[in-house]
Amino acid sequence: MSNKTAWWKKSVVYQVYPKSFCDSNGDGIGDLNGIRKKIPYLAKLGVDVLWLNPIYASPQVDNGYDISNYREIEPTFGTMEDFENLLAEAHEAGLKIILDLVVNHTSDQHPWFQESRKSKDNPYSDYYIWKDEVINNWGSSFGGSTWEYAEERAQYYLHCFAKEQPDLNWENPKVRQEVYDILRFWLDKGIDGFRMDVISLLSKDQSFPDGPVIQNKAYGSYYAGCANGPRVHEFLQEMNREVLSKYDIMTVGETPHTNADEAALYTDESRKELNMVFHFDHMHLDYDENGKYATNRVPLVALKKVMTQWQDKMHECNGWNSLYWCNHDQARAVTRFGNDSEEYREISAKMLGTCLHMMQGTPYIYEGEELGMTNADFTKLEEYKDVEALDIFKD
């Protein structure tokens, strides 16, 4: 199918964070049957695609982004039958469903890692990235070093996120084939595509260079050796050739530390990688030494410049934009980009919605964004059920 007529170019995507969306059984946690209950609402809202955050089996250290079994549903959310019913009912209502694909890392409880950590000579020994010593200054996104010692193997493994999320070794062709089999499993069930978590980090610079130390941090940034690495486009082209191109689906990659020129390489139709990417240029405009937890206002002129740059570049390179103001990793749009006071909340939400939907690209709406939801008013640390926030606080 040509990109000029691709269905995802005419779609609006609604992001569902299952835990907090709708609870069907009264246990205080959202679930798949809760999402099913809301299909009439979502269809009436006028969205076209539902993006579900991870629903796979997981210890939930990072709210499902630590996957222990890619072919099972997290019991908290329901069963595979529940998912299949949700998919069928969504399709019947004219809604498509895409799933979160998390394959930069797994849970440390995944059978691959449980085997890999046992020894240096078992079939899974090089499914992950192991070193005899801490070889660089990289710091994890969630605080501390990216290197964790495993006594059983007497080596260190790499984890760009929590220590319970070891990074997969994409240099190993067996790992890539395992991932492609997982893709086929879900695509053969009839899902309509994937949002690919931190997909720009798959290929590590095999020299593992030290990263720059900024803002008085204790560690260097791992992005210097991970983001947009030397083989990432090769890997994605292989994935597209072997799996993605065989289905009528949409793909969007989360690509931290990727500028518009680099994004063109991921999204140019002729390169056969991804349909679009999530960039972070507009997300970083209010950063200071506290990063995403800064309380600065977003500078309007700088925001306009960034959005214009991405509009122009994606049009120029025959790529496609993903348009978003917020998601599960970011502050609420009205609070961050508008004014969440009683006087201005509604008009701020309408202004942001108008801006989002009038640009070229596929709009993404985070659950509640259509209502003008604002940041949660948490006053106690224990109210935060987020490993990143808690680890950064401790760090």
Regions from the PLM with identified roles:
Residues 1-395:
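Active-site and adjacent substrate-binding regions of carbohydrate-active enzymes
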